[in-house]
Amino acid sequence: MYGGDEYANNSEYYDDYAHTGDPQLDMEYERNYYAARMPDNVKYFLINFCQAIKEGNLYDIQNMYENTFPQISDHHFDKTAWPEEQEVAAIVDNDKVFLILYKELYYRHIHARISGGPKLEQRINSFFNYCDFFNLIISAQNPVMLELPDIWLWELVDEFVYQFQNFAQYRARLTDKSQDEIQQLCVNHSNEWSILCILNVLHSLVDISNIKKQLEAISQGVDPQTVAGDFGKLSFYKMLGYFSLVGLLRVHSLLGDYYQAIKVLEPIEIHKKSAYSHIPACQISTSYYVGFAYMMMRRYADAIRTFSDILLYIQRTKQLYSTRSYQNDQINKQAEQMYHLLAICLVLHPQCIDESIQQVLREKNYHDAMFKMQCGDLEVFKSFFVFACPRFVSPCPPAADAPMEDYVKDPMEHQLLVFMDEVRQQKDLPTTRSYLKLYTTLPLTKLASFIDPNASEDDVSKLLIRLLCFKHKMRNLVWSKGPSGLEGTFKSGSELDFYIDDDMIHIADTKVSHRYGDFFVRKILKFNDLNRKLKNINI
């Protein structure tokens, strides 16, 4: 509806003004004053944006949200904030709903573009603006008749969780704050952006939308409208509820509670396409956090499947989001992180993956790093994990009397410690596997001498522990079916199995040979079907 060219070439606008003392005259004066000093394209955009939201015109709202707002931001507010609330209120007749939505974009812009990040006051004001928005839609007796595009609803929930994460990191960084600032944070702002508030909001959105019941109904082939309730019948509430489930996944992952992270998604069949997965950024974010949670739970097969599926999806649908540069950058970064995590999982749990994913791993030289990891290079494991992991946060901020240190990295270092402990337990397994693959029977003493030519009786006893570790680590819980990503059956991830009889290891190759016949039969049948359809087309 409104292109970027209409909103270019206007100058800066800031000046002082005086009040008359008469409330009505002052209000009229402010309206005229702010309208006069605001660039015409910004003023017209805000007026039209407000009108589109009032009328519920989704096409215009989405166009202005996805295209015009970023274009104006680039032209006028690249390194500065958008106009203050009172300036905008004067030209939109103090429209309460619009001002809340405008401030959501206003503070999001400050977080993304202002050098040095938002000030404490802006962080707190952003929190209270989110409270105003969620109170408006959750506390209402009847559903609020508000229409917003799904992409905005997703980015609103995603930004809400991001600002919580950002504030937690800001709060944990004591080295750049005075004692008075720390005291103020502990006394005056202890409840703002607290983990309890975040969880309460997200669970409230899930509950009011009945999204879990709707997803269960869909999986059972029942009309979801029968269980949606008055609020959940509306797309606005339904999508907010769905995106809140993904928000909860992210929050629990940031806290290091991986079981609960997967648990909150139970109504969603993670490994199946859904009618709700039409927002690429949401689908990619979901797979990233699910895959990471699986990896930390030592469910490597599920992690590999999750990462492989979404990386294939990114390869095939890149054109859908390439028009939005900031979203493209975010998705590319997350894809790079997932390639790093996939490389880790393939080292710890070798298995076949799609050839196109293998090709990317080869082209980007991941194989060199993977070889080093297979040889037990712990530093490569560590660097890959630090690059690819989420930016963890602590649910509890530092105390007011805590030493003046930077506590931001503490949660990440704890998760790294847990991960590296698991890696150390497995770093010798590739060597053990390589020897076992060469034999069908192998004496324990001979294997011990392969590993260490100077092996003693004690080393043979240690070898039994290593073989038991191999057995244990290669058996993983693997999801097969059902809505719960936590369910599954134990399967061996190794291509070989063995048992020990007295001092002899008996080894069996369990690798299943590929059957290509079924693949070609399916393709031939599909080709024949396509030929029949082409012949029936009348030109």
From Swiss-Prot:
GO terms for cellular component: eukaryotic 43S preinitiation complex; eukaryotic 48S preinitiation complex; eukaryotic translation initiation factor 3 complex. One of its GO terms (biological process) is formation of cytoplasmic translation initiation complex. It comes from the Eukaryota. Keywords: Cytoplasm, Initiation factor, Protein biosynthesis. InterPro entries: eIF3l, PCI_dom, TPR-like_helical_dom_sf. Residues 306-514 form the PCI domain. It holds the Pfam family Paf67. Its main location: cytoplasm. Coiled coil: none annotated. GO terms for molecular function: translation initiation factor activity. It is found in: Cytoplasm. Component of the eukaryotic translation initiation factor 3 (eIF-3) complex, which is involved in protein synthesis of a specialized repertoire of mRNAs and, together with other initiation factors, stimulates binding of mRNA and methionyl-tRNAi to the 40S ribosome. The eIF-3 complex specifically targets and initiates translation of a subset of mRNAs involved in cell proliferation. Component of the eukaryotic translation initiation factor 3 (eIF-3) complex. The eIF-3 complex interacts with pix. Belongs to the eIF-3 subunit L family. This is Eukaryotic translation initiation factor 3 subunit L. It comes from Drosophila erecta.
